[in-house]
Amino acid sequence: MSGWQRIYYKLLNLPLRVLVKSKSIPAEPAQELGLDTSRPVMYVLPYNSKADLLTLRAQCLAHDLPDPLEPLEIDGALLPRYVFIHGGPRVFTYYTPKEESIKLFHDYLDLHRNHPDLDVQMVPVSVMFGRSPGREKGEVNPPLRMLNGIQKFFAVSWLGRDSFVRFSPSVSLRRMADEHGTDKIIAQKLARVARMHFARQRLAAVGPRLPARQDLFNKLLASKAIARAVEDEARSKKISHEKAQQNAIALMEEIAANFSYEMIRLTDRILGFTWNRLYQGINVHNAERVRQLAHDGHEIVYVPCHRSHMDYLLLSYVLYHQGLVPPHIAAGINLNFWPAGPIFRRLGAFFIRRTFKGNKLYSTVFREYLGELFSRGYSVEYFVEGGRSRTGRLLDPKTGTLSMTIQAMLRGGTRPITLVPIYIGYEHVMEVGTYAKELRGATKEKESLPQMVRGLSKLRNLGQGYVNFGEPLPLMTYLNHHVPEWREAIDPIEAIRPSWLTPTVNNIAADLMVRINNAGAANAMNLCCTALLASRQRSLTREQLTQQLECYLALLRNVPYSPDATTPSASASELIDHALQMNKFEVEKDTIGDIIILPREQAVLMTYYRNNIAHMLVIPSLLAALVTQHRQLSRTEVLRHVETLYPFLKAELFLRWEKAELAGVVDALIAEMLRQELIVVDGEVMSLNPSHSRSLQLLAAGARETLQRYAITFWLLSANPSINRSSLEKESRTVAQRLSVLHGINAPEFFDKAVFSTLVLTLRDEGYISDTGDAEPEETLKVYRMLADLITSDVRLTIESVTQDDA
């Protein structure tokens, strides 16, 4: 680089350092994309822009990547480390410099022909200032066009703080040269593929143009399905066609989002400021798989679990900072109050009622609107649980919106729809106190401005947040495999409900819940809560708590729940220090050391966090319970117990394994428990290790309440085999409530209606009861005896005394 060029770049860099604050995507490009900085690296940019080049340089230097302004020296030849695919427009359009990208690609490929050991890593890089998609009418060009110098100056001045540098996975020029050759035609193909790559990347980052709201309504009104529904509305309610059409427009106004890029930018600033003060960090995992889906042109439907109202904002914020378009979000109509409703609407929320029953016009308008979002290529987000979990466990899925998603596919759309399950975890959920009150019978408070202000005023240190993207579920692939004839039901006008739709939707929903749990995140808060709630006094010395966390961490690291699940890299001691900063626990000091206490009033609230990872530890807890209670038993007996109880655990906690996989899982966990010296193994026989009995007992306590709940239902069923399902659920809950009072069980989900409903349905599915309610007394009594051996004698006596009291 000449001296004049250095001076030019230094002068240009002065205003950029002030105006531009860009973000790298991914956050650690070398690590996440597997770049080997010991090998040559070159950068490919979409078009000639010195501002883009210097913005890229700043990020490269910040992440220890090679400086793009430093040329590559290969065998005495100096080549630029960057290539612009397109020369880009200029102020004077008649002057366009000669495009050099093809020549540079050819030079690089030619060097690979002459040097067999050479392997240059070609890294495509997009630098974006602002991401407004523009409107379908009004603007001639979208804002992300190739800008000339003056346009670029204004873009950088106005949008420099809303910019990012997107690094794509590298391409090996050695592989290109070996597989495709090194002549000029290959260089031209390389440039053409790069252009397509950048065009797709721009679309993934900004999304399609936004429609004028009224134009969208007019298009929906013109659809045959809504026109027919309007006619039915006029006829059934005996009103004029115009009045029925006005009703349809009013419903569109109620439902439709009013997406605004400026509102996204403003909210991003506010949230960035807020997150930095409330959260100690937002941990994001597996975002690259979603970026790849967007790049490949998939219609993405985000399906997160629902913990808090914060989910709406957090997920959009995370996606925006991953270089993706914030989705259109299905939000409950209860959030459509001033001022939250209009703000959420501009952030992409469209509102959905709790029920569609009895309102054909509403269901038709909503279905057509959702279908229109898909056909235009907007990403969509909805909570398949239907509402926020009050217990910290996943709720049974509500399948209405998922069913409409598949019906949208049956319109014959060409873009593949892919469902992306997402696990959202927090170390503090702001509504957790309200949830506990509602579970105890308090009426749910209606969302309103005063309630929102009260909630915001209580926000303090929220610890860490977690957003883990699970394994995507491509709908077309799923239907091709499970319903090969699905294309026969395609109808571009009618909302088709073929016979296979309901069972298929139910199976997909259950699969999604499993995939959400597969992406679970263990953290300091849920691990500490699990350990302290396992102690009957809700207190442990610091040494005991450290030892127990080490046990959990070793289990989760050495026998991971799933490939997508995450476990903290910090030590047990560091996690305890972090959890204590959250001010949920009390510490008593004496001459021996610290005692960490979970106060009684906090215990119920902390079950929420324990339940977030209950599925990740329930099988190790069951194994620990078997060894603790039996003291000694064979592997065969252990597996028999696990296989008997697993269907109920799987249904309740959306566990990932099939029955055939259990033997391998159990063997791996036994090996880990042996490594930790929690148990002793002599041939086929496992027994308790007395020197580590406390850790094993605390681990076993994770399954204690679940086993007690199962024991209640199996005892009632064996005592009264002809009891109907409804009565069995009701009586099980009554006994559970009594048990919680008599034995100090502080978990609200212990007598949760939904938990017993799932249990009774699983009893039917597993053949313990029939549809008429008649039970198999021998089988139920056998399972009850198995469960009775795993619970304490006082709890067992309380359960068995119920039927005696009734007698």
Curated annotation (Swiss-Prot):
A motif (HXXXXD motif) lies at residues 305-310. It comes from the Bacteria. It catalyses: sn-glycerol 3-phosphate + an acyl-CoA = a 1-acyl-sn-glycero-3-phosphate + CoA. Pathway: Phospholipid metabolism; CDP-diacylglycerol biosynthesis; CDP-diacylglycerol from sn-glycerol 3-phosphate: step 1/3. Its EC number is 2.3.1.15. One of its GO terms (biological process) is fatty acid metabolic process. Its main location: membrane. GO terms for cellular component: plasma membrane. Keywords: Acyltransferase, Cell inner membrane, Cell membrane, Lipid biosynthesis, Lipid metabolism, Membrane, Phospholipid biosynthesis, Phospholipid metabolism, Transferase. Belongs to the GPAT/DAPAT family. HAMAP family: Glyc3P_acyltrans (MF_00393). This is Glycerol-3-phosphate acyltransferase. It comes from Klebsiella pneumoniae (strain 342).
